[in-house]
Amino acid sequence: MQCARRGSPSGGPIDETPPKVVRLEPNQKTLNFNSDRIRIYFDEYIKLNELRDQLVVSPPLEQSKYLISPQGLPAKYLQIEFTDSLPSNTTYTFNFGQSIVDNNEGNVLPFYKYIFSTGSSLDSLSISGQINDAIKRNPDSFVSVMLYPYDSVFTDSIIFKDKPIYYTNTLDSLKEFTIENLKSGKYMLV
């Protein structure tokens, strides 16, 4: 018979897998959305990194109209709670960029999107492109791409007075962008 030896457990292989979505309340691409919250459940504890810089909501919502948790503490779900009613017949996209990471290793769930509509259909148009700079060979790696409605009230100063209806960012080195779930109409791309 021998005495136990002191030591630390060796652990296992390093986790290189990003978090996986296991359940949604309500489901992705829900129509006639009328709930006051959305919950996205994961297979492991997650945390949100740089949410303020990474999250893109299209069309934009005032930050006072929704709260996102967890912030600061790990959890097995992400919650979007609405503090005010949403306009009808609108398709919303919450793009989390690279903010959703697992708690232990920091593996990123890249560009996870949650999409829903307050109307009876989802807007399905999209636009994509690549950023080029006429002066520099290499454009900045972080570029904002914005769409403004091009209608009877459009003026060339709209970009200084109003927020864009849709926007995205080039958050990686590819300098490519895509904006999806657009409502049919004319837009100015900035």
Predicted regions and their residues:
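Acidic, low-complexity Ser/Thr/Gly/Pro-rich repeat segments typical of extracellular/periplasmic
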Residues: 2-190
